[in-house]
Amino acid sequence: MLSPKRTRFRKQHRGRMKGISYRGNHICFGRYALQALEPSWITSRQIEAGRRAMTRYARRGGKIWVRIFPDKPVTVRPTETRMGSGKGSPEYWVSVVKPGRILYEMGGVSETVARAAISIAACKMPIRTQFIIAR
């Protein structure tokens, strides 16, 4: 699972996901890509599940690039704990994804293989996505 090696601070504010993604919204490495259409937090487990699904389907052919990285810690309080006494401890990592962001890229395979592999990965995501091809 992906997570930062070290961070400056252990805990972060939740923040807001306003607007669309201006960075990371173009295909850079491969020929085919999976693009987010909704804003959401995507956990490191979901990213890894999508990557594994694509890798299994493509077998040895092709190359896969993961364009998002989970750099935001999400804190969770223990169950049946009263309010107060500070913020919970960091439990897992998420990537903040806005509409338009490229999640995965793929190259070195035919369009049919890429479309099938990316659609399997799209099923692992908690948001609506679309398959796009580089010009």
UniProtKB/Swiss-Prot annotation:
Chief location: plastid
Disulfide bridge partners, by residue number: none
Keywords: Chloroplast, Plastid, Ribonucleoprotein, Ribosomal protein
SUPFAM superfamilies according to UniProt: Ribosomal protein L16p/L10e
Record PROSITE patterns: RIBOSOMAL_L16_1 (PS00586), RIBOSOMAL_L16_2 (PS00701)
CDD domains from the UniProt entry: Ribosomal_L16_L10e
Top-level lineage group: Eukaryota
InterPro entries hit by this protein: Ribosomal_uL16 (IPR047873), Ribosomal_uL16_bact-type (IPR000114), Ribosomal_uL16_CS (IPR020798), Ribosomal_uL16_dom (IPR016180), Ribosomal_uL16_sf (IPR036920)
Pfam families: Ribosomal_L16
Localization annotation: Plastid, Chloroplast
One MF term in the entry's GO annotations: rRNA binding
Any one GO cellular component localisation term in the record: chloroplast
Swiss-Prot/TrEMBL GO biological process terms: mitochondrial translation
Cell division as UniProt keyword: no
Gene3D superfamilies: Ribosomal protein L10e/L16
Family recorded in the similarity comment: Belongs to the universal ribosomal protein uL16 family.
Quaternary structure (record): Part of the 50S ribosomal subunit.
Name the record gives this protein: Large ribosomal subunit protein uL16c
Species: Calycanthus floridus var. glaucus (Eastern sweetshrub)
Record gene name: rpl16
